[in-house]
């Protein structure tokens, strides 16, 4: 054995007698100072037999060996000569020359000199060979060991098998059972769900079912004057568990002479249920029942490993076709090919003696074996192996002897492989065995079957702490300035210098050990990568005198032909489902192809302006660093991420992070981020590719590539410290008054603010530097406010893009509670009328109905008015007026016809209108007449005079301001402000039609149309005196 730095091991297992003999000879001939033990593999240990005494563990602590007896050798280097039995000790005689005793001398086992008090209570164990069996992992494991106590439960194997058979009869083997996936049905209100369970002796559970709940049957109470009449008897089936009663008047229609047509019993498919019985208008006959789809029945199938679900037929929501029908099909995974052999995903193969590869997604990921260091003068590399092993020098002998090992005779000098890690050599009749020296440079090495040394698949730098580099100060270079990256110092930190191409290429190949016979692959900078080029196809040399700047075309075999390429390579990182567009020369460009009109419904081709200021084409996908985003009909739809709520009052979203955090929080919170064509929404519902829905009142989502992407309202800046949040608003709002500019400011000279990045903002303009911070320009100074987040009660709050505070999605997902009445479905809180006297209301699944009570009338002969519930006296009835069109002139002098809509008075209206409606007074209770108010003439005068006064004031103000060359508001519609450029001592203005206007100190003017920047959420004026000024930009005159 030899010293191996960092090695894991040799010996102690396997053919112990041969190995120990070889080890003794090796240690005797060489100056060994370390013992290398392999990882313990007890399956290769041989049970010591016919031991005269007890057994002890070997030198490596893995296998057992016979203990040394009296007068037998013991000890030696690392105890390779064995340990003495109980009651004996290993005695080493001192050297005759007077040298000191080392740890490598061989001793002899002798009786221990025990004192009488030491022998008290010492009783040697009487070890015997005991055979038996135990049940381990569902199998009978039998064996024979030498021990003092019997560790076996069954003395014979037949007894163990009988016990195992009894266990198997009581509990079936469900490892290979294939159970049908069944979804729990949605039970009607009169029944409860009984979950399925596996009966004794079976593996698959019974299907869940609905059973009638007697407690769900409620007794119906009728109003005075009505009787509770049984309409249909309960059948005992879910949906028909309760007797159906209806309230009918005491003096109802006589049904004795009515002959009802026969009603056939409806047989509903398994995915639907039969609705309740309905009556005709007279209440004598029953109408045919209908079938409606069960809610919550549709689900997504779960396929076994190696197969994926595929839609066979799509459901349309009708009984029998309520849900989509799926089937599980085998998925075809990409394979890797090496030496004409196919390897599938996860398979590992050997590329050469030192390189191993694993197939991952059709790509071979290769890595190199890790060999340890050898401290020996002579070594060799066994045939077919990568790592070398040590060998002893072979001296010439006259009559060398052979070796007998593993049933074979080996000649002097022969080498052979004992196992994956042990290599032996025959030297003069004795086998000398050594182990391969393995190195380890990673945390989790992978064991390759048939190989000794494990290999490292992960990079080794994970065990090295990254350098603590500070920010690069006093450097004007940006990321875009250094195409090949920044230069690094000796600590691995950036310097204010750009790399050149040669330095970048050298770094990519510096640690590469691959020997590629056909060269290396190159990247976009034409630098060689540590990846081998595939074997080139056998192509004839091209005899062509053409000069092709873009290269030659290739045929179907990949060989060059004498035709020039007309298009350059397309370096594009976009993901386009329908491919790329072509330019006028027929070459591909980095733009996604639009959907043809015949492929489906028309899709808007508008572009998306993301919150980071980039434009994206319709149906384009990208990743903004935190979320997957998608441009859908001009809207930026991004995935919801899960973020914890910050505990401080002024959180912020730092550069390079996705979730809000506190200033003293150094732990970076990473957001938690399928099968294509199916999306599983947070509310538990499934949606297909391209389907759009509202997850709450503020968030619209769409299904794209198996991901739920959502678009939310962009909230304006919050110019207060503690905004309030209401349920009817998607954005938090400020209840305090916004900051006002000082009155002493000279309004003749417009003020503006400039931030650290050089952006210019107009006076009273507000913006959001990030999702948690809002700023405003007041008196040429920037004031910023930080939004604080309230605590939430859910475990996984989500964060919308562009917003600061996470919130609980469970609180916003409405519960779809509906009411079923007379064969119709009504939403929660929906009202409807059965007739003029009966009004119903849906409240949390309960149908509540009210009947109008008619008051007594003083007249003798009341009349019945059509559309009214209660009769009325003739003197109280007012006929409905005729709607005669009235001619009115609008502000342009044109004649408009206006048809007045007069209300119909009724004593039975549930919702009473206010008594004062503009210049008309409505009083139903007094005389049921409409009277013009006394102020009608005054309102007419005001409506004419006030606009004239306002117009004159505006004209006079305009003339006065024009003389002083002041700033005046433009009467234009509000729009998102444009981002001004960085200016020096210039006055900035915004024109509603022409864009950004700049006035220099001189008479010259510059005009430029500015691109909108999504970071600036709009112009929010602070001037409360003029409402027109609050929504307008300013222009110099």
Swiss-Prot record:
Residues 35-112 form the IGFBP N-terminal domain. Pfam families: Antistasin, CRIM1_C, IGFBP, VWC. Residues 962-1037 are cytoplasmic. SMART domains: IB, VWC, VWC_out. Residues 35-940 are extracellular. The modification Phosphothreonine is found at residue 1036. Disulfide bonds join 37-60, 40-62, 45-63, 51-66, 74-90, 84-109. A motif (Cell attachment site) lies at residues 314-316. Residues 469-498, 505-532, 539-564, 567-592 form the Antistasin-like domain. Interacts with BMP4 and BMP7. May play a role in CNS development by interacting with growth factors implicated in motor neuron differentiation and survival. May play a role in capillary formation and maintenance during angiogenesis. Modulates BMP activity by affecting its processing and delivery to the cell surface. This is Cysteine-rich motor neuron 1 protein. It comes from Mus musculus.
